[in-house]
Amino acid sequence: LNVHEGPNGLRPKSLYGHEACIVPGMITTDEPGVYVEGSHGIRHENELLCVKHTENEYGTFLKFEPITYVPFDIEGLDLNYLSNHEIASINEYQQYAFDHIKDALTQEEKDWYLNNLFIK
């Protein structure tokens, strides 16, 4: 059983016989993480939808939009290792997720989310 189905995949090195173009409509995962052997690790995973972004004289450009609207658990992050840009990206995603689920939340849940799931 393999939870990762092709043909698309992003790797530092192409696998012979597994080359595939990424096209609009494809869904792929973004799984950044770090593991300390024999100790601990963390990984945040999101599903991303490939969509057309813009077209100009240089070609057609695509982008990825998250389609997983689950906030990251920031308590597992050591903020000392994150740049300001990385913190801003995490907070941007937290807001994106909130905007997609807020109508299903009670006011108490909204308040908790806004007070606990952003890096200050």
Which residues does each PLM region occupy?
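C-terminal active-site-proximal or functional interface alpha/beta core segments in diverse enzymes
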Residues: 1
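Charged, cofactor-coupling segments
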Residues: 4-120
